């Protein structure tokens, strides 16, 4: 079963790279491998009805994130052998960053699909849609499937590419994520934690302490709180002018 999963993943990555000879040493392979794993982490689709309605998860997006960081906090309370603790902290770093990425992705999709104005801003500002071409006779069919196309595109988007996420939040939703150099570093470190079991490109073991995890939880939680408040304010009905 595991070999079938890896074969399917490799085939998908080669399709995205448009290179049938690509392998794990090809530029972009690791990022796409990460994306494939995250897109296939659930047995059932996260979003169910593409063409008609946005289907939210049973828990709130913030609730799902909070559950992840609460679990991480509880695990840090355990008394472990130093060698075990080092590896647990490495796994927790990857888990927390993944939880934030999931929140950023789900929140952006939900908010964008909630308004035709936001959908239009996305279509007009994102190069992926700006470069698409179709014939006159396709206008109506493309219009009917627009929301479905957008939902699928956003779900497939690699949301740990923070350089892409930040401007999308700003240009489409008008939400400024603020200065987050720590997040760029956390995402880069997550890559080593997830794909190299805590070792960097040179084979050096990365260092993650309990203080690092606690600080990461605080920064991620603060960012989630900010975005959640901004989204709530943004979606409030505007008072009518008399």
Regions found by a protein language model. Give the residues of each.
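Polyanionic, low-complexity intrinsically disordered segments
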Residues: 1-56, 63, 67, 178-185, ...
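Helix-loop junctions and short alpha-helical segments
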Residues: 43-183
């Amino acid at each position: 079963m595991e070999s079938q999963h890896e074969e399917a993943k490799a085939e998908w990555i080669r399709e995205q790279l448009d290179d049938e000879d690509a392998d794990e040493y090809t530029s972009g392979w690791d990022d796409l491998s990460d994306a494939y794993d995250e897109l296939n982490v659930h047995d059932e689709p996260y979003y169910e009805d593409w063409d008609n309605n946005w289907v939210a998860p049973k828990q709130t997006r913030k609730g799902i994130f909070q559950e992840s960081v609460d679990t991480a906090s509880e695990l840090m309370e355990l008394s472990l052998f130093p060698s075990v603790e080092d590896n647990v902290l490495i796994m927790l770093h990857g888990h927390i960053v993944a939880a934030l990425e999931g929140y950023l992705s789900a929140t952006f999709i939900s908010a964008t699909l909630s308004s035709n104005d936001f959908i239009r801003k996305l279509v007009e500002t994102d190069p992926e849609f700006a470069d698409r071409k179709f014939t006159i006779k396709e206008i109506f069919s493309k219009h009917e499937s627009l929301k479905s196309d957008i939902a699928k595109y956003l779900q497939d988007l690699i949301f740990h590419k923070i350089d892409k996420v930040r401007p999308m939040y700003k240009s489409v939703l008008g939400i400024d994520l603020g200065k987050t150099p720590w997040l760029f570093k956390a995402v880069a470190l997550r890559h080593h934690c997830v794909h190299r079991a805590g070792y960097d490109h040179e084979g050096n073991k990365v260092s993650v302490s309990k203080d690092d995890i606690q600080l990461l939880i605080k920064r991620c939680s603060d960012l989630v709180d900010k975005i959640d408040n901004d989204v709530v304010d943004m979606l409030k009905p505007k008072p009518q002018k008399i």
